[in-house]
Amino acid sequence: MKTINNPKRKISVTNQRSYCDWTDGIQVVRKGNGEIAMTESELTRVFGVTWRKLNHRLQTLMKSLNLHPDERSAGEEDIYANEQLKGYAPLYSLTTIIALSFQLDSTEAHLFREYICERLLKPASVITPIFLLGNTNN
């Protein structure tokens, strides 16, 4: 899993989002603040597949009626080169990313599915409220 940071690409400041990436210990980490949404290039890096394979699976998902229209797209990201706007890259929501992971057969996709299942099975923290009755001044 080779990660390449392209300094020519900038993320729009108005579009605050998170994305998934890998640590050196082959663990999924969430980076950024906001809802998870990823571009095709980020998805190819995370799932360790070629763009062609990823694009084919994405097109299949988008054409199927299994996803609600709101789950299919998470907006667009501005693409800049030499400080000039060159175009837009579609962003895919977490729902689409999870569905896509079940259509890919890479080791990274398998580990991502395990991570998602682990997070779902992990019990949520329970906060016990404490109510103070009567005079609370000491």
Go through the PLM ranges and name each one.
Residues 66-82:
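Short Lys/Arg-enriched helix C-cap and helix-to-coil transition segments
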Residues 57, 61:
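Residues in the recognition helix of alpha-helical DNA-binding motifs
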Residues 1-42, 46-47, 51, 79-138:
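Positively charged, aromatic-accented nucleic-acid-binding surfaces
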